[in-house]
Amino acid sequence: MIKNRFGRRHFLRGMGGVAFALPLLSTGIISRDARAETTAEGVTFPKRFVFMIHPNGVIPQAWFPTRGPSGEDSDFQLGESHAPLEPLKDKLLLLENVNLEVGNWDRAVGPGEPHQKGMGGILTGRTLNDGQFVGGDGSRAGWGSGQSIDHYLAERVAKDTPLPTLHVGVRADSHIGSEVRSRVSYTASNQPAPPLNDPVDVFNLMFTDAMTDPGAMDEIKRRRGSVLDTVGSQFDSVYKRAGYEDRLTLERHLKMVRDLESRLAVDGGTIGGDCEKPATPPSLEVDSEDTMPQIATEHLDLVALALACDMTRFVTLQFSNSKNGLRYPWVDSFGDGHGLSHAGPSNETAAKELRARDRWHAQQAAYLLKKLDEIPEGDGTLLDNTVFVWCSEIAVGNTHSHRNLPILMAGSAGGYFKTGRFVSYGSERSTNDLLVNILNAFGQDVETYGDAQYCNGPLSGLT
Amino acid sequence: MNMKMRNQAAKRGGLLLCLSLCVLATGCREGALSYEYVDASQVPTPGQTSPDDGGKENSQTPDDPREDPPIVIPDGPMAGRSPMRLLTRYEYDNTTSALFGFTISAASEFPSENLADGFENNAWTHNVNMTLLRSYINASESISARAWEDPPAALSGCVGNASSSALCLEGIEDFTSIAFRRPAYEDEVALYQKLYRDMRSSEGARVAFETTVQAILQSPQFLYRLELFEPSPMKLPPRDGGMDAERFELVGPYEMASRLSYFIWGTMPDEELLAAAERGDLNTPEVLSEQVARMIADPRAREMTRQFHRQWLGLDAFGSVVKDETAFPMWKDGMSQDLRLSIEAFIEHVYWEEGAFDAFMTSPAVFLTPELAPLYGKAINEESGGLWREDFPAEERAGILTQPGMMALLAYPNQGSPIFRAIWVRERLLCQHLPPPPSDIQIEPPDPDPNATTREVFAIHTANEECAECHLLIDPLGFGFEGYDALGRWRDTENGKAIDTSGELIGSPEQAMNGPFDGVVDLANRLADSEAIAKCISRQWFTFAMGRPNDTSDADSMSRIYEQFLQDETAFPSLFEAIVLSDSFRYRKRPEVAQAEFEEANPDLVAMENAAEEQGGE
């Protein structure tokens, strides 16, 4: 049974003293405060991490802000590419001179070419494994070699959301399929977490249960619990008869089954209260340049809703894959993306197309961030309780450098980050350091993440 | 932007992509090409070059060719690793269809497999994740609900007027064994029967039925091809040459039934295979040969061949193929799908009608649709009612390398790509890999001249000393393909200039194959006669069959597979049979041997596991 769009309020969890009615918003999304918890510090809301990536670098002149006359971090003008984000400027945090040290081409760390290293290293903080993937230059690399921070956090701070993470892609598997250049998120070394490219699949994964009548859902959950119990018991039967290597695989599988079991048992994940029923996305051709903009919008709507409904707190959002050769005809870009990115500085036609693409990506970011910012949570908005990071897997296409990776952040993670600033580092810093900042924002007391030799402690000046 | 500008912009983009190779791929030597085919004929080769780490701290810099240690080929028959294999989406849907007799295609909502060597079924990279695990729940719920309406024979006693708890409990035992592709253990059956009884008493027959089916469909024994270590009932004498019985054992009969059926059909064993397994004689060469012959004659073998080529040749990329409307006004949406069908029809033709690898490399047949025919200068065959075969002039077309679909796939929207084509030949057909790039070159490419021919533009690579080294392995090979444009059409001129199709192959694994050639037909004929390419294709099939690339333990099997393939004039059925009859397919390492080797190869992992165990971890 599907609940009516303007159906009854169904609070999913004991609300303590914080249940308060919220107005319907014109976006069709209603915020959900069911996850709010009353602690000694007052009412707190969950923190979220949303990571967005697009391939082949940026035009730095159009990406990086211009600093104002005062020289203050808060005195800056957004770059041309980020014009769509102007209304949210106070909630942005832009970084300069942060390098992807685990990929840095100048120093050529680990196997793989720059696109591969960027994808597999950005969220794991590690160099790649050896392996069989052929990069754009014919060289070879394997998968990322460690857990990415989204999964690290999901295991530690969000054990009771229906899904630990959500990975969505707009043509993320296009052309090359599932390989190191099309994956950013890892549950562990060699264990990439695949994005879903079809909004219908995302919808089914995230919201089938949510659209079931809560009473019926309780029954379904009980049954699923019994099924998974039996599945777990059967593991013992095969485990004791399996070979050593297979036992390791079985253990990994069982660990995930147990995690899923506990998440499914959580009271929640049904439509009601402040989480609205999403419209079923249309069925679209998922690997086509004709549908890319629409699929992006569908995904962004679902991501916003998944966060609003607290289905998950960790999202990766991927526009195609690295070194892709896609065209963006809807912004008059008919060159292939990777080819364009290699153009020399005098190639104005290519630069124009790339700027148009960068701006379109910024529009997508703005669309999502605006939605999140319209969902009230306590005194602020859902965006305020989020840290959003957008970057590319390389800095600039025609050099493939990992120096000064373009990084735009938004949201303060519940007031942890001081936004509305453009922070530049005199001495070059590592993206691993930024991962540490993010982990710290989630209350994780760590000083390094990934490979410690590329860590220098959290980036200064962000909090 | 007007159309002309669009076209030029697109062209620039395309050309510049190629130049990226120039930026990245220098430091090449012929000897730096790695060759992934290993068999018993190869003498151990020392590292081709001495590691030149030039005092760099990180031993894994691209300056350092990171040569594998010298290959040591073991003597005599052996079998490689046999890790458990998660069903792919294709296998999952086939298996549930075979098990239930209806098709739901639930796996279409699963996330895609993680590829290795282009293949989806790699035992180590195709593994579970939370999204997939969650999708398994949804899939099992859809399937079990449908099965209540339309139960499989084994479970017919659970549903309907004549149903009873006792009948259903009996049925569960049978059904579990079928779903698991082996006799279920008593403890397993007891678990599912308990679930059924508990649910039946609390929630009734339907919920009990559905949850029991769900539990079976979510069990690892269903989701994986999990080979448990039971002693094989067979006491076969090892074949000549002697398999070391201390280290290896025959794969059990039910497990062999699954190896066969998933390799040749991409689905679970049928009744005949299970019956042969029950008799216990499945793993004899005679019975295996009979079964392979029977299975190859089944349409499911054709579908499996399509799956193999979809992965090996990267045909899913047709989904992304677009062509520039200005350069090719005759191009229409949907033609990429026709080109894909054309390639599939060609493969079907060479495998099942011509039947030999030689045709794969040299047949002038091209399969056309009414949409495609005018594009390639042919009249529409009104009578065909679908795809039809056209034999093109032998000087224009020879086999897979000249298929219009392949040429269009290995191209940009507005022009062909010598680079894509050459790398594809190296990687996919020669099993060769280019060395890693140097670390210290940054070149900003010049703006190319849009009126130049493709060949002229790429001459930049070889004119530049830094680029030339590596591009000599790529460009001269790719230039041979200049006779085909971005649609795979035959052409004599480009931008008003005569096409030059001269090319050169250097550094191939077979000395006799190297040297100048004129056009792809010339190249294709040379490759068709070569051992290296026949070896490579047998390696690709082996990788697909085993769910892992060959390793040194498979060297003896690889030799025998290849010899059989060659002896039978590269007939594909012989190749399939030879793979099935190989030691690698029929034997596996004994559990204690497998464990010892695994532990030796993964000391860190083992230390971690032991530490977790000591901490009383799960």
Identify what each model region corresponds to.
Chain B
Residues M1-K11, P44:
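N-terminal secretory signal peptides that target proteins for export/translocation
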Residues V23-G27:
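C-terminal motif of bacterial Sec signal peptides marking the signal peptidase cleavage site
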Residues C28-D75, D240, N610-G617:
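Ser/Thr-rich, Pro/Gly/Ala-heavy low-complexity intrinsically disordered linkers and tails
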Residues E67, E113, N122-E173, L226, ...:
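Short, functional "switch" segments adjacent to catalytic/cofactor/reactive centers
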Residues R146-W148, P152, A205, L223-E227, ...:
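Long, ordered, helix-rich scaffold segments
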Residues S163-T212, P220-L223:
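A conserved hydrophobic secondary-structure block that centers on an alpha-helix together
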Residues A179, A373, R389-A528, A532-A534, ...:
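Sequence context surrounding c-type heme c attachment/ligation sites in exported
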Residues E286-W424, P435, E614-G617:
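A cross-family structural signal marking well-folded subdomains
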